[in-house]
Amino acid sequence: MAHYAFIDENNVVVEVIPGRDEWEIVDGITDWEAYYTTKREGLRAIRTSYNTVAGEHITGGVPFRGNYAGKGFTYDEDLDAFIPPQPYPSWTLNESKFVWESPVPYPEVELDEDGLPVASYVWDEEAGDWFEMGA
């Protein structure tokens, strides 16, 4: 089953729906993006891959359009990819993984005997660094 993102005039995703696979032909319809575009006035439908995250296909297939689209994501026509919202102004887009990266890498996390993290961190935009939660 394919999925389609509806984008507005600013290329922002407003809705994602399941739909027909691109190889299906029903009632002579062969272009499902064009078909679904006719179903939402003022919006454009673009196929998205449920199995694509951060530029990789999670089951080993071919990644498609950077990320599975989500509401609020932006479709970048130059990259042909769905980009999540920028979490902080200081973060920059990794154009090969299609994700935002902090200016300071996430700290290495120690794991306990059960393999669970002993600490987690939160980004502080004003300080420009990660801080341990609960510390």
What does each of the following model-derived ranges do?
Residues M1-A135:
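Interaction-interface detector
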